[in-house]
Structures are given as structure tokens and as C-alpha cells.
């Protein structure tokens, strides 16, 4: 018996449907983080001291300027986000240091070391703290940085004032004056980093600098 073969003429051959893999879009939060990461990298680069334009930033991120403004309404908001990141990071590390160390002198030592290490490892953010990255930006950003240093100084004041309660010893100098000096030391080191284009590692000489501070705790 010969099997009848069906003719395929005039019949379309249907190829199996192949699903195109979907490319997951980044969330707004992820895009915002990407923009900030690229901005930090640009601030750290050789052109980090130049005026930061949205055109340059958009090109590095790989989006249009219009798309950039979907994630941040203005360049000022981008820098504000960076300053908030610096503030939250350093203050949380200070809090952690306070949990790990109870002796006031050691607390101050560890906190100063933490701050200088952060500045050394994050040149782009250090340029924000010194104001060099903000020279062509809105004046409110300089005020925001000043607010950060005020909060840092208050942290030092609180730690120093707790010494009398925790250790039964007071300072011969007003705690606010000492705190102001500690913040000035940090700001000076930040400026030194930027001035030398981060060639000098000031944290290597921190222990020598600490010798001038240590007598305050005697």
C-alpha cells in the first residue's frame, strides 16, 4: 500500500516562534545611582577641576541631556545627592566607631583616621567638600557643604563633652574650641589633597600629626 503524500504547495510553513529575550530596563533609582557614579568618576579624572556640564555628563552616562533630567531635575540636585551621600556615609562610620571604642581619646583618633581615609579613597568627593567642584555651581551647594562641617563639628563636641560623664575627667579647654580645631584639621588635609592632586598620602603622617593633638587628652 502506497501512502498518499500531502502536497505542501500553497501552504505556508510556520516557523516556531522564537521569543526575543527582554532587556530589563533600569529603575529610576538605579539610573540615579549610575548618574552619580559617573559624576564621581568625572570629578576624580584629570578634568575634574573643570566646569561640569550636563552635556559632558550625559555623554559619559550614555543618555541624552533630556533623559538626564528625568532622573535629576537639575545639576544642583545631583551635587546635593553627592553631599548627602558623603554626610550619611561619614556620620554612620562615626557612629560605628563610637560603638566600637569607649575611650574618648581613641574615639577621636579613630574618627579622624576614618575621615582622612575616606577623603584619600574618594578624590572626587573630596573636591566637593573643598568646594573646588562647586566653584561654577549654585551658592546653595557651598552652604550645604558648610552645613555638613557644622554637623561634623557638633559630633566632635558631643563626643568630647561625654568624656566627663564617661571618664570623670574634663578638658582644660572648652570642648567647642577643640572640636573646631579638629574640623579645621580635616578641612586642611582635604585642601592639601586637592592642592597636590592627591599625590601626597597625608594619612601616612597622621600618627605624627596626632602627637600634637594627643596632649589635649592628658
UniProtKB/Swiss-Prot annotation:
A Pfam short name: SlmA-like_C
HAMAP family in alphabetical order: NO_factor_SlmA
GO biological process entries: cell division; negative regulation of division septum assembly; regulation of DNA-templated transcription
What NCBIfam families has UniProt attached to this entry? PRK09480.1
Q: Which InterPro entries does the entry mention?
A: DNA-bd_HTH_TetR-type_CS, Homeodomain-like_sf, HTH-type_Tx_Regulator, HTH_TetR, NO_SlmA, SlmA-like_C, Tet_transcr_reg_TetR-rel_C_sf
What does UniProt give as the signal peptide span? none
Q: What protein family is recorded? A: Belongs to the nucleoid occlusion factor SlmA family.
Put simply, this protein is called Nucleoid occlusion factor SlmA
Domain HTH tetR-type, which positions? 30-90
Which species does this protein come from? Haemophilus influenzae (strain ATCC 51907 / DSM 11121 / KW20 / Rd)
Compartments, as annotated in UniProt? Cytoplasm, Nucleoid
Q: What GO cellular component term, any one, is given?
A: bacterial nucleoid
Q: Which PANTHER family match?
A: ACREF/ENVCD OPERON REPRESSOR-RELATED, ACREF_ENVCD OPERON REPRESSOR-RELATED
Q: Which GO terms describe its molecular function?
A: DNA-binding transcription factor activity; transcription cis-regulatory region binding
Summarizing the function annotation, the protein's role is: Required for nucleoid occlusion (NO) phenomenon, which prevents Z-ring formation and cell division over the nucleoid. Acts as a DNA-associated cell division inhibitor that binds simultaneously chromosomal DNA and FtsZ, and disrupts the assembly of FtsZ polymers. SlmA-DNA-binding sequences (SBS) are dispersed on non-Ter regions of the chromosome, preventing FtsZ polymerization at these regions.
Keyword terms, alphabetized: Cell cycle, Cell division, Cytoplasm, DNA-binding
Coarse class of the primary localization is cytoplasm
What subunit structure does UniProt give?
A: Homodimer. Interacts with FtsZ.
Highest taxon listed in the record's lineage: Bacteria
Q: Which PROSITE patterns match?
A: HTH_TETR_1, HTH_TETR_2
Q: Annotated DNA-binding ranges?
A: 53-72
Amino acid at each position: 500500500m502506497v501512502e498518499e503524500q500531502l502536497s505542501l504547495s500553497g501552504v505556508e510553513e510556520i516557523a516556531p516562534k522564537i521569543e526575543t529575550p527582554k532587556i530589563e530596563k533600569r529603575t529610576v533609582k538605579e539610573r540615579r545611582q549610575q548618574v552619580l557614579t559617573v559624576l564621581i568618576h568625572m570629578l576624580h579624572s584629570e578634568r575634574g577641576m573643570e566646569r561640569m556640564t550636563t552635556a559632558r555628563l550625559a555623554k559619559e552616562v550614555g543618555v541624552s541631556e533630556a533623559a538626564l533630567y528625568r532622573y535629576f531635575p537639575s545639576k544642583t540636585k545631583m551635587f546635593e545627592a553627592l553631599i548627602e551621600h558623603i554626610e550619611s556615609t561619614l556620620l554612620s562610620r562615626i557612629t560605628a566607631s563610637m560603638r566600637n571604642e569607649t575611650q574618648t581619646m581613641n574615639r577621636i583618633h579613630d574618627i579622624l583616621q576614618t575621615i582622612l581615609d575616606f577623603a584619600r579613597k574618594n578624590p572626587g568627593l573630596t573636591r566637593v567638600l573643598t568646594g573646588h567642584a562647586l566653584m561654577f555651581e549654585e551658592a546653595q551647594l557651598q552652604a550645604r557643604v558648610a552645613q555638613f562641617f557644622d554637623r561634623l563639628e557638633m559630633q566632635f563636641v558631643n563626643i568630647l563633652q561625654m568624656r566627663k560623664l564617661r571618664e570623670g575627667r574634663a578638658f582644660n579647654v572648652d570642648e567647642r574650641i577643640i572640636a573646631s580645631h579638629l574640623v579645621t584639621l580635616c578641612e586642611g588635609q582635604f585642601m592639601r589633597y586637592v592642592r597636590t592632586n592627591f599625590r601626597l598620602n597625608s594619612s601616612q603622617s597622621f600618627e605624627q600629626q596626632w602627637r600634637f593633638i594627643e596632649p589635649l587628652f592628658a
